[in-house]
Amino acid sequence: MAKTIVIKQIGSPIRRPAKQRATLIGLGLNKMHKTRELEDTPSVRGMINSIPHMVEIVEEKG
């Protein structure tokens, strides 16, 4: 089974650059305090690291 990571949106995309909004959409987040469980891959980690002020890692599984 692949490793997974649970992330939660903690920041609003209002008044943020379009690239940051697009990154949130790419992660599947669009509303405050929503969570998603994603595969723990380098590309997902890179997206999370590009917007650390808007998302937090809730849990790492696997």
Curated annotation (Swiss-Prot):
<comment type="similarity">
    <text>Belongs to the universal ribosomal protein uL30 family.</text>
</comment>
<dbReference type="GO" id="GO:0022625">
    <property type="term" value="C:cytosolic large ribosomal subunit"/>
</dbReference>
<dbReference type="InterPro" id="IPR005996">
    <property type="entry name" value="Ribosomal_uL30_bac-type"/>
</dbReference>
<comment type="subunit">
    <text>Part of the 50S ribosomal subunit.</text>
</comment>
<dbReference type="GO" id="GO:0006412">
    <property type="term" value="P:translation"/>
</dbReference>
<keyword id="KW-0689">Ribosomal protein</keyword>
<protein>
    <recommendedName>
        <fullName>Large ribosomal subunit protein uL30</fullName>
    </recommendedName>
</protein>
<dbReference type="InterPro" id="IPR016082">
    <property type="entry name" value="Ribosomal_uL30_ferredoxin-like"/>
</dbReference>
<dbReference type="InterPro" id="IPR036919">
    <property type="entry name" value="Ribo_uL30_ferredoxin-like_sf"/>
</dbReference>
<dbReference type="Pfam" id="PF00327">
    <property type="entry name" value="Ribosomal_L30"/>
</dbReference>
<keyword id="KW-0687">Ribonucleoprotein</keyword>
<dbReference type="GO" id="GO:0003735">
    <property type="term" value="F:structural constituent of ribosome"/>
</dbReference>
